[in-house]
């Protein structure tokens, strides 16, 4: 696929996404080799498309590509953590949480991610509340 064809397809995909036509956006996304794309923001958007369609593992795989392109992005690390929870991979979510805290020690989203991990683990309500009160 050349650059022109890639640009046309991504514009169509983004138009469908804007109209909340997630299935059509996913069909276009399926036709693109995302390993060749260097734009982490575009990869993040494609991951969201797969997430909207309930394909969490595919979305996570695309996010890993984005993380390779932008390893210092706290947004990508946070989304990796939430997607890991959606596929019930608590260990990976915990790793993402630890990485997120290193990248953004003052970001309040770390407490939300910690709470989500505790809730998925079935921790006591007291522990969950404590995580949010921090």
Role assignments for model-derived ranges:
Residues 5-35, 45-52:
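Alpha-helical segment of the N-proximal tetratricopeptide repeat
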């Amino acid at each position: 696929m050349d650059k022109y064809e890639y640009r046309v397809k991504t514009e169509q995909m983004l138009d469908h996404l804007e109209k909340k036509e997630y299935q059509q956006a996913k069909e276009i996304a399926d036709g693109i080799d995302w390993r060749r794309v260097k734009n982490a923001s575009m990869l993040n958007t494609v991951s969201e498309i797969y997430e909207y369609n309930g394909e969490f593992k595919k979305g996570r795989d695309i996010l890993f590509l984005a993380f390779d392109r932008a390893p210092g992005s706290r947004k990508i690390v946070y989304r990796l953590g939430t997607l890991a929870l959606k596929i019930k991979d608590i260990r990976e979510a915990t790793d993402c949480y630890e990485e997120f805290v290193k990248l953004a020690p003052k970001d309040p989203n770390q407490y939300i991610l910690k709470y989500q991990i505790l809730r998925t683990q079935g921790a006591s309500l007291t522990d969950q509340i404590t995580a949010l009160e921090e």
